[in-house]
C-alpha cells in the first residue's frame, strides 16, 4: 500500500499518483467567458452535434476523455479503470459517453463534487495497486439539468438572484504512476452536512457548511493552514456560498486570503448575467482540467487545494419539502513529489 491513513477522512499518498494528461470541453457560453482560451474544445451549440441535449452532454464527456488520451499519448486499452459521473438520472452522461471505450467503469454520483470524488477514488485505486493508470471525469449541461431539476426551458421561469448557472462542460484527468505531475498528495473524504436549507435556488448556502467541514478536516489532518497553499479552490459555491464559507472561517479567526471558487472563475457574472455564478459537475471539472492544472505546470501555483462541493438533492426530495444535504471532497495537488 502506497498510502497512509491519517484519519477517518484523510489519506496521504506515499508515492503520489500524478497527472499524465487532462482535457476540458466547454459549451458556447463557457467558451465566451474569462477562461475560454484554456479549454481544449468549445461546442458550437447546445446539442454538441447530436440530436438531444442528453446525447450532447455524453458527447462532451466522451470528447474530454478522447482528448485527454491523445494529449497523454495513450489509448483506451492503457487505462485500467475510469471513475465517472454526472447530474443525470442513472448517470447517463457518463455511461453513454463510455460505452464505446471498453474501459472498466465505476459510476459515481456526488452531484457537483463529482470531480473531487472521482479524483480521490482514482488516486486511491492507483496507490492501492489495483490500477496503474486511472481516469477521473464528469460533465454537466445547462439544458439537461434545468429539465431534470427545475422546469422545462420553454417555460422561461424567473431566476432568483441566488441562483447559479449550470455549466455546459466536461473534464477528464488521467492519473498514473509514471507522470511529470502535478501530483495528488492527499485526499480527504467529505461527510454529509445538512443545515436545513430547503431553497433549491440557493445551493451555495446549502453546500458552504460542507466545504467548511471538509476544509477544516484537511487542515487538521495534514497539519497545514490556509497559508500553506498557493490557492484554495472550492467548486461551485458561487458568490453566496463563497461569502458564507469565508465568514465561517473568519469567525474562527482564520483568513482565506488565497481562496476562490470555480463558479466565480468560469463566467463574467456581470457581462454574462450569471447571477451568483456557475455550478454543475462540469464547472469545477472544466476549471480544474482546463485552467488550474495548466497553471500548476506553468509554475503559477506550487500547491493547490481543490475542494468541489455538491448539493445532494433530487426533484422528489425537494417537492417533499426535504432539506438539501451538502458534501465536499478535497484533494491536494503538488507541483513536485517532495511536497508530500
Give each language-model segment a name.
Residues 30-32, 93-95, 145-150, 243-245, ...:
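Short acidic, glycine/serine/threonine-rich loops at helix termini
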Residues 109-137, 175, 279-300:
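Active-site-proximal alpha-helical scaffold in enzymes
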Residues 85-90, 112-113, 138-144, 190-192, ...:
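Acidic, glycine-rich active-site loops and adjacent beta-strand->loop/helix elements
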Residues 19, 53-112, 228-243, 247:
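Conserved beta-ketoacyl condensing-enzyme motif
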Residues 79, 130-131, 229, 301:
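Short, high-confidence coil segments that cap the C-terminus of an alpha-helix
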Residues 1-54, 152-216, 221-224, 256-273, ...:
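Condensing-enzyme catalytic core mediating Claisen C-C bond formation in acyl metabolism
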Residues 57-73, 119-121, 206-221, 287-292:
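Short, well-ordered amphipathic alpha-helical segments that serve as non-catalytic structural scaffolds
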Residues 233-253, 257-292:
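Internal helical hairpin/lid segments
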